[in-house]
């Protein structure tokens, strides 16, 4: 057993990742490929190991948010196509080509300048480009057919750029009202038809995120982008209630009790601000996790953890590196007891979705903000096979 200096860790069940991939694979058309989205350190799960496992079990391409995230994967020996979904400045064009990382782009001037940069550098690699079409997200992308045609012409005229994909992004595919999703789909298809009428052969076409892939598998086109669903989390309660695909959460967050005390003497205040006052003989346990680890300060006096299969409340304010929980009056607990912060223990569960609802946010934020300083234990075939951590362990 690995002994951590600071006993808090994340368990990532790669068997669950495999199940989720296969569940989506069965749900979408056979011809549609799967792009595994591993941005934000794999939504907090760890991008390298999730990417490797996804590629082993059905994904053919990867997506990230930045060139830097892509380079991390390349340095780990991953050779599959990697698409940067976000905007990339021209200063990173040369680097992207050198590392064979595909960029999303949508501006004629950007295309021309990128080509000039690579021409001056006599780049040995042509830079792959996916054109981003804005059909209703209002974030990035071309917005008119005429604009799209000019971008395509600039791209096809370039000697150092190559066109390998075109995509859009649905903004409300996770909601019960499907009006905008269908409108976006119609608009995107009309853009593609417009290009075809110009005699332009289309590269890989993709539009579905997890929500759209589940709710509208007929929109899957050449490829879908599987993000939150890869990790066993649903994009929304609505998508989960459709009961079309069964997903299994891959992440658990755990810790061991660092210290236990019975609050027999005054003052019985707990944590900053003295917002919690313990009862006589109340047992308070300290856990080595705080808001610097991604456990939100908004859970102060509100959150719960699992101890010996029972829910126990957070006592007082969440601090940067530690929280305190109440084991109750004359409660039982000892240093070294395992506590589950997100996940299951003896039939009880605190789900990421529950925590997200408590915080008035979404599950994406809860997992993606988990700090890199927390060790990740990767589980495969029911056993821990790798530990990824910046913290020394013996």
Swiss-Prot record:
Its EC number is 5.1.1.1. Its cofactor is pyridoxal 5'-phosphate. The modification N6-(pyridoxal phosphate)lysine is found at residue 39. InterPro entries: Ala_racemase, Ala_racemase/Decarboxylase_C, Ala_racemase_C, Ala_racemase_N, Ala_racemase_pyridoxalP-BS, PLP-binding_barrel. One of its GO terms (cellular component) is cytosol. PROSITE patterns: ALANINE_RACEMASE. GO terms for molecular function: alanine racemase activity; pyridoxal phosphate binding. Pfam families: Ala_racemase_C, Ala_racemase_N. One of its GO terms (biological process) is peptidoglycan biosynthetic process. Keywords: Isomerase, Pyridoxal phosphate. Pathway: Amino-acid biosynthesis; D-alanine biosynthesis; D-alanine from L-alanine: step 1/1. Catalyzes the interconversion of L-alanine and D-alanine. May also act on other amino acids. This is Alanine racemase 2. It comes from Bacillus subtilis (strain 168). The gene is alr2.
């Amino acid at each position: 057993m690995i002994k951590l200096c600071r006993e808090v860790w994340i368990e990532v069940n790669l068997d669950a990742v495999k199940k989720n991939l296969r569940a989506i694979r069965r749900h979408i058309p056979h011809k549609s490929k799967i792009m595994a989205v591993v941005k934000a350190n794999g939504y907090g799960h760890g991008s390298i190991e999730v990417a490797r496992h996804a590629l082993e079990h059905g994904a053919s391409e990867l997506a990230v948010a930045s060139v830097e995230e892509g380079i991390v994967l390349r340095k780990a020996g991953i050779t599959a196509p990697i698409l940067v979904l976000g905007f990339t400045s021209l200063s990173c064009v040369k680097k992207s080509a050198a590392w064979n990382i595909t960029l999303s782009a949508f501006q004629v001037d950007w295309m021309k300048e990128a080509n000039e940069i690579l021409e001056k550098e006599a780049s040995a690699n042509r830079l792959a480009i996916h054109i981003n079409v804005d059909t209703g997200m209002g974030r990035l992308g071309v917005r008119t057919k005429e604009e799209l045609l000019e971008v395509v012409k600039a791209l096809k005229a370039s000697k150092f750029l190559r066109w390998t994909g075109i995509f859009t992004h649905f903004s409300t595919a996770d909601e019960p009202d499907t009006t905008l999703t269908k409108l976006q789909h119609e608009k995107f298809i009309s853009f593609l038809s417009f290009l075809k009428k110009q005699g332009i052969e289309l590269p890989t076409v993709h539009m579905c995120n997890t929500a759209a892939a589940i709710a509208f598998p007929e929109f899957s086109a050449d490829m879908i982008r599987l993000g939150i669903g890869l990790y066993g989390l649903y994009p929304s309660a609505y998508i989960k209630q459709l009961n079309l695909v069964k997903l299994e959460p891959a992440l658990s967050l755990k810790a061991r009790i660092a210290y236990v005390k019975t609050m027999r003497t005054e003052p019985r205040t707990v944590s900053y601000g003295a917002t919690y006052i313990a009862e006589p003989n109340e047992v308070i346990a300290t856990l080595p996790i705080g808001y610097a680890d991604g456990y939100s300060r908004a859970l102060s006096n509100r959150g719960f953890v699992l101890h010996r299969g029972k829910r126990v409340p957070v006592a007082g304010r969440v601090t940067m590196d530690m929280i305190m929980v109440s084991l109750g009056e004359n409660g039982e607990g000892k240093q070294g007891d395992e506590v589950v912060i997100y996940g299951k223990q003896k039939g009880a569960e605190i789900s990421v979705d529950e925590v997200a609802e408590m915080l008035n946010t979404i599950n994406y934020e809860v997992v993606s903000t988990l700090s890199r300083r927390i060790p990740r234990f990767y589980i495969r075939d029911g056993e821990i096979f790798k530990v990824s951590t910046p913290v020394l362990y013996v």
